């Protein structure tokens, strides 16, 4: 489980001309030419050349595989993570509701609604904007399955227009046990928000997830898409009508996923996703009318996470202007303010804000750094927004001249992709430790991930029951590698100084979370498509492979 504090800062002062294929090639050519700013990894170009090329398609495939390891409920016959089994089959029984399904957020067995919904929102956003890239890599079906496993659960948990089940399990009792999910004996108490105990942040985030997913399924399953949109609209109405933070209503969540940023960002986020899903101007007006009072255009943010949605919603609002949305014209003034804040975040990632304190820190090895606990969640979400915004700029009507407007100098779309790529590469092993922070990728990766199911022998190999204390005695404390590889999991990652200790007890660094991996699905898909495009273009230009001398130059 991850905790975090929002970094809210005072506001600072202040027709397509190319084909898609050409844009892909031009962007990647620029990306390849730009330095990755990994100063501490400066053992030299020779060491870099000796490394094998990174396989973004494999990273994408394993990212989606990870979500199957996090499944709760009755697993399907198509389950590919075979060391897992059915779990949580009586969830909701005490309360008389069916809450079987959904995802475990990290290395334990609580189902927390807020980070689960954010995970699905990010998976859906990536599937909307980069559908062709995911499909080109052959992973579209798995992406849909990952999204649907979450949305099926959200529909179940929304048992009444003004009732939503926020959590199943209890973090305190869960942490006293080290068991496989198939054996768990901890509390499966369920907690809800309703009229008297509101949760606008949770309702808003879940509405955003369902609205985004409704777009994903619009063509392949119109009936299901309509169902998701119906629940999204009801949940938004619930969150807006009965306002309050869910952690004020549910004490048990405060130590794990407290909503530090409040609920205003989730309501704006949900409204913009509903506008994108429906095209109804009423949702856009909501985001415009509440832009100031809800902080949408008042806060300059250097974090995008399961808690703080401002940067994400600001990018969504900016997209309306970049796309030339007809409804945006009447609200251009406010939407320009949203765009300014979106660009403040992106410029902060690039280090292009004049005031250094307004920029995101970097480790010596080039990792974007926000805080010590599970920092890679912030690097992955930043990589996504950089990738998405560069895509919007490249696809806009003024793509030939479009650039990110930063106080320290404009940045082209290719430069944003370059930074996103540097974060992806850092995660995959291009870092000072030469260690992949994606489990199962590459030759070296964390072997002692803080994850109950992965750290205990599979029940399919040894079906004997393992109790709470026995799990700690026999499995948690042992120094050997986990018996099950949690493939595709992105762990919390290294310190500000690029230091990492592979220890099961070091949960700040070795625990993986669903929202670490979710944003990277689209990033890996995009990078795979771009590298494939440039390879194809090079082959088309020189189908015979060129002369030996030219091939030598190409390798350099």
UniProtKB/Swiss-Prot annotation:
GO function term, MF aspect, one: cellulase activity
Active site: 108 (nucleophile), 450, 502, 511
An example Gene Ontology CC term for this record: extracellular region
Disulphide bonds in the chain: none
One GO term (biological process): cellulose catabolic process
Annotated catalysed reactions: Endohydrolysis of (1->4)-beta-D-glucosidic linkages in cellulose, lichenin and cereal beta-D-glucans
Entry EC number(s): 3.2.1.4
Keyword Cell wall biogenesis/degradation: yes
Subcellular compartments: Secreted
Keyword field: Carbohydrate metabolism, Cell wall biogenesis/degradation, Cellulose degradation, Glycosidase, Hydrolase, Polysaccharide degradation, Secreted, Signal
Gene3D superfamilies: 1.50.10.10
Top-level EC class as recorded in UniProt: hydrolase
Chief localisation class: secreted
Range of residues in the leader sequence: 1-33
Family: Belongs to the glycosyl hydrolase 9 (cellulase E) family.
Protein name (record): Endoglucanase 22
Organism of provenance: Oryza sativa subsp. japonica (Rice)
């Amino acid at each position: 489980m991850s905790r975090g504090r929002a970094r809210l800062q005072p506001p600072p002062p202040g027709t397509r001309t190319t084909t898609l294929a050409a844009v892909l090639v031009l962007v990647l050519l620029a990306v390849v030419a730009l330095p990755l700013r990994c100063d501490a990894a400066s053992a030299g170009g020779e060491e870099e050349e000796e490394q094998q090329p990174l396989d973004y398609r494999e990273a994408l495939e394993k990212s989606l595989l990870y979500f199957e390891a996090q499944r709760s409920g009755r697993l399907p016959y198509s389950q590919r993570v075979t060391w897992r089994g059915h779990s949580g089959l009586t969830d909701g029984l005490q309360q008389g509701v069916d809450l079987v399904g959904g995802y475990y957020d990290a290395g334990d067995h609580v189902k927390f609604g807020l980070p689960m919904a954010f995970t699905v929102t990010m998976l859906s956003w990536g599937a909307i904007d980069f559908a062709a890239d995911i499909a080109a890599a052959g992973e579209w079906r798995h992406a849909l399955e990952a999204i649907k496993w979450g949305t099926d659960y959200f529909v179940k948990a929304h048992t009444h227009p003004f009732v939503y089940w926020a959590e199943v399990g209890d973090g305190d009792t869960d942490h006293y046990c080290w068991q496989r999910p198939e054996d768990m004996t901890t509390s499966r108490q369920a907690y809800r928000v309703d009229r008297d105990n509101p949760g606008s942040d949770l309702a808003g985030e879940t509405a955003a997830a369902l609205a985004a997913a409704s777009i994903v399924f619009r063509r392949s399953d119109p009936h299901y898409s309509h169902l998701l949109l119906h629940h999204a609209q009801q949940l938004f109405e619930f969150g807006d009508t009965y306002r309050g933070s869910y952690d004020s209503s549910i004490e048990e969540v405060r130590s794990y996923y407290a909503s530090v940023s409040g609920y205003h960002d989730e309501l704006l986020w949900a409204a913009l996703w509903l506008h994108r899903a429906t095209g109804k101007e009423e949702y856009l007006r909501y985001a415009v009318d509440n832009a100031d009072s809800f902080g949408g255009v008042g806060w300059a943010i250097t974090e995008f996470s399961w808690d703080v949605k401002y940067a994400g919603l600001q990018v969504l609002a900016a997209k309306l202007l970049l796309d030339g949305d007809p409804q945006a014209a009447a609200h251009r003034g406010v939407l320009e303010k949203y765009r300014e804040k979106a660009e403040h975040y992106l410029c902060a990632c690039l280090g292009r804000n004049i005031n250094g304190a307004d920029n995101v820190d970097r480790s010596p090895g080039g990792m974007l750094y926000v805080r010590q606990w599970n920092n890679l969640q912030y690097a992955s979400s930043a990589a996504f927004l950089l990738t998405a915004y560069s895509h919007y700029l490249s696809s806009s009507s003024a793509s030939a001249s479009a650039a990110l407007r930063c106080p320290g100098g404009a940045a082209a779309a290719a430069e944003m992709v370059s930074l996103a790529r540097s974060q992806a590469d850092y995660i995959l092993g291009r870092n000072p430790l030469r260690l992949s922070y994606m489990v199962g990728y590459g030759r070296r990766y964390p072997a002692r991930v803080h994850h109950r199911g992965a750290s205990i022998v599979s029940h399919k190999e040894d079906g004997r029951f393992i109790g709470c204390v026995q799990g700690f005695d026999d499995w948690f404390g042992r120094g050997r590698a986990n018996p099950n590889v949690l493939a595709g999991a992105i762990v919390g990652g290294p310190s500000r100084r690029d230091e990492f200790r592979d220890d099961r007890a070091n949960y700040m660094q070795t625990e993986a979370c669903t929202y670490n991996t979710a944003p990277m699905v689209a990033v890996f898909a995009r990078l795979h498509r771009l590298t494939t495009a440039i390879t194809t273009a090079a082959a088309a230009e020189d189908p015979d492979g060129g002369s030996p001398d030219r091939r030598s130059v190409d390798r350099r």
